[in-house]
Swiss-Prot record:
Protein name: RNA-binding protein Hfq
Family of this protein: Belongs to the Hfq family.
Highest taxon, organism lineage: Bacteria
UniProt KW RNA-binding keyword: yes
Organism this protein belongs to: Citrobacter koseri (strain ATCC BAA-895 / CDC 4225-83 / SGSC4696)
HAMAP family assigned: Hfq (MF_00436)
Gene Ontology biological-process annotations: regulation of DNA-templated transcription; regulation of RNA stability; regulation of translation, ncRNA-mediated
Annotated signal sequence range: none
A GO cellular-component term linked to this record: cytosol
Amino acid sequence: MAKGQSLQDPFLNALRRERVPVSIYLVNGIKLQGQIESFDQFVILLKNTVSQMVYKHAISTVVPSRPVSHHSNNAGGGTSSNYHHGSSAQGTSAQQDSEETE
């Protein structure tokens, strides 16, 4: 299963490391917003005013608020483990919008 995550892990790790605000759309249409605090094979820990554990099987799309360069991680940094933990990040004004439908 490591080959299937060869794009996913560097992308999520770049979002975590750079503390990029993200919108995560779930398969049921709910939109969550915040910063990726950490992730593993099955879940993403999303931090806004509170931390939420979001199961990856429930995620449809992850949309960063700005472009990130995630391919530069292939030359060695921090992808040796399947668990990535971020430092406790500075507070953001990101919020959860569970009622939004478009």
